[in-house]
C-alpha cells in the first residue's frame, strides 16, 4: 500500500514550529479545519477579493486607536497595551513572538498592513470571538466575517490539514480552476506566499501575501503619497 512519498510531503510531516506562538497558530488552524470549509474553488476566493479589501480597511480605525503616539506604527509597548485592553491571555514570550512575527520589515514597529495580519492572528487564537466583538466596538462586527473568510481560504488550500500549505497543494487548488497556464500562476502565487523560501507556507505568510493580492499595500502607498503632498 502507499505510493512514493515526495520530498515536499516528507518535509510537511517533519515540520516543527519554531516558536510557541507558531505552534498555537497551527493548533488553532487545525481546530478550525475540523469544521470544514465553505470555499469550493480558487476562483471563488478571487471573486471575494473586493469584499475582503473593503473589510480589511475597517481595521484602520482600530489601528489608529492603538497607535497612541500617531506616528504611523505600533511599537512594542503599544502592542502590549493593545493585548491588555483586548483581555487576551498572551504571556510576555507570546507577545514578543507576535510582535516579531508581524514586524516583517524588522523596523521595530507594526505598520497598518502588518497590523491587519496581527488582528487576524489574534482573531484565530481567541477562543471566544464574541469577547472580541464586545471589546472592539470600532469596526469589529464588520471585521469578523472578513477574518473568517481569510481563515476559511487557508483551510481550503491546506488539503491535508497540517497547518501549512505546500507547493503541491497550491498547484492543485489553482489547477482545478481550469485556467490556461494555471501551473505557472500557482507557482507565482506560492512564491509570493513563501516569504522565507522554505517550501512551506504558514498562516502568517499566507496573510501577508493576501493583503498584497487584494491591494492593501498599493492603496497604503497611495495614501502616504497624498499625505506627503499635503504636508
Swiss-Prot record:
EF-hand domain residues: 54-89, 90-125, 145-180, 181-216
Domain of life, source organism: Eukaryota
Residues noted as binding Ca(2+) 3 in the record, renumbered to the chain: 194, 196, 198, 200, 205
Positions bound to Ca(2+) 1: 67, 69, 71, 73, 78
Keyword RNA-binding included in the entry's annotation: no
Keywords tagged on the record: Calcium, Metal-binding, Repeat
Record Pfam families: EF-hand_7 (PF13499)
Binding-site list for Ca(2+) 2: 158, 160, 162, 164, 169
One function term, GO molecular function aspect: calcium ion binding
Signal peptide interval: none
Gene3D superfamilies, sorted: EF-hand
GO cellular component, one term: cytoplasm
Entry-linked InterPro entries: CML21-like (IPR052591), EF-hand-dom_pair (IPR011992), EF_Hand_1_Ca_BS (IPR018247), EF_hand_dom (IPR002048)
Calcium keyword on record: yes
Function: Potential calcium sensor.
PANTHER family (alphabetical): TROPONIN
Protein name as it appears in the record: Probable calcium-binding protein CML21
Natural source organism: Arabidopsis thaliana (Mouse-ear cress)
Gene it is expressed from: CML21
